[in-house]
């Protein structure tokens, strides 16, 4: 593209101990009555206390809202927005994975708007956001979604997903502290980590890629490739957690500015129809989508192979692109995620409905370097079911 639109959140604190910046930022924003939106499990294990205790010690009024579930349905979004509207809050803090952060963004913005959440959905909504809403601070506790730096809130519908998206959803402050991720269990570490990798990979091959997003994406891939396996094997590995937090943050910035594409388009129906975690949906499809589009972006796939730790010095560009797909397959397997749709209990009979839903994700599909039509999408799902990489001429 000739002119790139580059957007970053106003302010981020990134690094071990970054949570120490929370109280100063709350003071700077002039808040008094704070709504914290978080996962109930994070309250149970005491992690949310690390956020709320310093605030209460400073005399702030803090209400903790925990009606948060993974892959939140539209109804959950409506409830969070209604709660934010009814309260007299002047700041929203999101603490958790992508679901909690997405709900926090949604509640903060729609708290000052009329109508339902459904009115503002990307695919079917009829209204547009007109006001910034309440200030928001986003604090991720996983290294994967990148929600703390994007302007999107994802909601599950009956069989697929839709989004509310506008720059008003951007955080006023993002606080990325790797020490908050140390307690994340291996499977979640793996799923969110591959989610971050997918963000970087898809941003790098996106038709909207720019030199800025390219630099962010490659740096993210390097960090994730060297540290995700370590973080899965040993959650207390401080350097691995630091690398993953930074990698996820950079990947989030990359895909926010370049966009994600086919992997996410095909992953959304897996979550909508079978309630598979978003990161795992991306992970199982990543090698198959990238293998299918490989011929349309061989140079970039070769670059990704090198960023993953490969060495293409003695390989042709085409050979390196093949090796990239193989490495992505190996990476997903190494962190323990099933390599086929059947591994998640998805029957072959579901491929038709998955295809019909994925075709509707035009916003995502438009960014693919290879236009993916209905037949292409069906071929990729069939490949992911069979566990065999296919390309268009072989499909």
UniProtKB/Swiss-Prot annotation:
<dbReference type="Pfam" id="PF00465">
    <property type="entry name" value="Fe-ADH"/>
</dbReference>
<dbReference type="InterPro" id="IPR018211">
    <property type="entry name" value="ADH_Fe_CS"/>
</dbReference>
<comment type="subunit">
    <text>Homooctamer.</text>
</comment>
<dbReference type="InterPro" id="IPR039697">
    <property type="entry name" value="Alcohol_dehydrogenase_Fe"/>
</dbReference>
<keyword id="KW-0560">Oxidoreductase</keyword>
<comment type="similarity">
    <text>Belongs to the iron-containing alcohol dehydrogenase family.</text>
</comment>
<dbReference type="Pfam" id="PF25137">
    <property type="entry name" value="ADH_Fe_C"/>
</dbReference>
<dbReference type="GO" id="GO:0050060">
    <property type="term" value="F:long-chain-alcohol dehydrogenase activity"/>
</dbReference>
<dbReference type="InterPro" id="IPR001670">
    <property type="entry name" value="ADH_Fe/GldA"/>
</dbReference>
<dbReference type="GO" id="GO:0008888">
    <property type="term" value="F:glycerol dehydrogenase (NAD+) activity"/>
</dbReference>
<comment type="function">
    <text>Long-chain alkyl alcohol dehydrogenase that can oxidize a broad range of alkyl alcohols from ethanol to 1-triacontanol (C2 to C30) as well as 1,3-propanediol and acetaldehyde. The best substrate is ethanol. Also oxidizes glycerol.</text>
</comment>
<protein>
    <recommendedName>
        <fullName>Long-chain-alcohol dehydrogenase 1</fullName>
        <ecNumber>1.1.1.192</ecNumber>
        <ecNumber>1.1.1.6</ecNumber>
    </recommendedName>
</protein>
<feature type="binding site">
    <location>
        <begin position="98"/>
        <end position="102"/>
    </location>
    <ligand>
        <name>NAD(+)</name>
    </ligand>
</feature>
<keyword id="KW-0520">NAD</keyword>
<feature type="binding site">
    <location>
        <begin position="141"/>
        <end position="144"/>
    </location>
    <ligand>
        <name>NAD(+)</name>
    </ligand>
</feature>
<dbReference type="GO" id="GO:0046872">
    <property type="term" value="F:metal ion binding"/>
</dbReference>
<dbReference type="GO" id="GO:0004022">
    <property type="term" value="F:alcohol dehydrogenase (NAD+) activity"/>
</dbReference>
<dbReference type="InterPro" id="IPR056798">
    <property type="entry name" value="ADH_Fe_C"/>
</dbReference>
